[in-house]
Each structure stands twice: as structure tokens, then as C-alpha cells.
Amino acid sequence: MRIAFLGTPAFAVAALDALDRAGHALVAVVAQPDRPAGRGQALREPATKAWARAHGVAVLQPEKVRDGTLAAALRALAPDALVVAAYGRILGKDLLTLAPHGAINVHGSLLPRWRGAAPIQWAVAEGERETGVTIMQMDEGLDTGDILLQRALELREDDTSETLAPRLAALGGEALAEALRLLEAGAIVPVRQDPAQATLARILEKEDGRVAWESPARRVADRLRGFTPWPGAFTTLEGRTLKVLEARPAADLAAPAGEPGEAEVVAGRGLAVACGGGTALLVTRVQLEGRPAQSALDLANGLRRKRFRLGT
């Protein structure tokens, strides 16, 4: 097939690799514009743009996608299908209906669960034990199109969104190649989504990372894993921001007496923090505002205290 690809971050590169291996003709890669990044705020090109340049594929980086300009440019390339993977923009009907096979999306969840911009993060943060990828025929709704193919993946106990994303990306590439093969053969029967089963994976905000110590320890740990690397998990210690970098539920430890957020040193292990329902979270690595990351025990030693309150 002649494919026009729309995608921006590293997650989308696995789909490009899969299309290339399957012998599809990539007529263009459409990515978001280069953006300032890092401390120096130097312009950084998207991962998909770097891939396209390395493979000799034309790159388009429009600021706007709904003024007809992009649709006209792609129409001139006569693609058989548009493939979309984490592009980060909402496409209008002119793009969705441009190619004979329409627009096909690689989505990082088992739709209709986790429709939206952050499916990987929310699946981990909500304690899912299984997620996966969906190859979907796009429509004008938010991830509401018909399902062409799905592949499931079991989450590991220590998965974060950062460790899960590359595995889902690879699985998505494999599923995409298979779906296109079946589509060309006329062997796919699209399946409508059940809206009653839908959940929303909204865009993450900084405040999502604030630890709610009144939640059970398992939920606090799941949120930490889901929100790694951004926005991370953070609390306060005597008015200073404290990032919680590593923690896990500790069923073998009694929760410190007092309100949720009460923390005490567990010799040789870390900080036991009281959470909701009488549960305990063992915090092992932290970063106090203005300091480098350190073990929770080193933090306690530096404060010369065995017990203190978090969230104050």
C-alpha cells in the first residue's frame, strides 16, 4: 500500500519500522513541528521526523491540520491509507476520508477502554493487569471508530508507563502490519465499540502526581507507576516538594500510627508511610526540593529524625 503516516513521538517509530519491513510505500511522514526542549530550550525534532530523514521519506510539519492545506498536500500523493500513531492532533473529515482505506489508527489500549490522549499512563495508574493495542478505523469521535484488530499484553508487577510504552509500541507495529495485510485481502470484519464499556484517558496534569495518602497503598503505588516519568509522584515535607521516585505496597509492615502520610524509618529498608485503610507504603527512593535524588533512608538520616509527616 501507499501510506501517508501521521505520528510524532518515539511510540510511533515502531509502526514506521513495521510498515517499512512489510514493504509498504511511505509517501510522507507528517509530524508535529519541532519544539523547544530541555534546559537550553533548543529546538528538538520529533522521533518520527528523524526516522523519515534517515529513510529518505518526505516530512511534513504543518502548524495547522484543519485548514485544508495538509489534506491537499496528501491528496496529491494519492495514498491508499492514512496511518495515525500518536500524532497529537485531531483530524477533520477531509483527512479521515481522503484515502480509499480511510485513516487507520494505532491506539495504545484495548478499546473502548482508555479512549483519549494518555491510555498507557491511565491503564497503569488504575492498576490494570492487562492492556494492549487496538488498530482502529478512525471516525470523527474521540477513539470511537470500528475495531479492526486487537492484541493484548499482560502488565508486569513493576511496569511503569515508561517501561510499558516500548512494548506496546512494538506490539502495535506488529498488529498494524497484520491488520493492513488482512485489509488488503478483504479478510477483516470491523467491530463496533460498545460505548457502555468506554473509559476516558484524559490528558495528564501536573496535579495528578500529588500523592493522596488517604488512598490505599496499592493505589498510591499504581499511580506512581502510571505517572512515571511525568508528572511523577510528589508530596510535601514541611513545605518543600518531595518527589517519591520508588515505592511499593508493604503488606508485611504495619502502618505507622496516626493519620495517612505519617512516615517512620524501617531499618535497612526505607520509610513506611501510612496510607488509607490501614495499609503501608514502603518508600525507598526520593528527591527533596533543591537536592539530588537519594534513598529514603539517607533523607531520614540527613533530617536526623525517625518519624515525620508527609503532605504538610
Swiss-Prot record:
UniProt entry tagged with the keyword Transferase: yes
Catalytic reactions on record: L-methionyl-tRNA(fMet) + (6R)-10-formyltetrahydrofolate = N-formyl-L-methionyl-tRNA(fMet) + (6S)-5,6,7,8-tetrahydrofolate + H(+)
Enzyme Commission number(s) from the entry: 2.1.2.9
GO cellular component, one term: cytosol
Annotated binding of (6S)-5,6,7,8-tetrahydrofolate, by residue: 109-112
Function of the protein: Attaches a formyl group to the free amino group of methionyl-tRNA(fMet). The formyl group appears to play a dual role in the initiator identity of N-formylmethionyl-tRNA by promoting its recognition by IF2 and preventing the misappropriation of this tRNA by the elongation apparatus.
Protein name in UniProt: Methionyl-tRNA formyltransferase
Native source organism of the sequence: Anaeromyxobacter dehalogenans (strain 2CP-C)
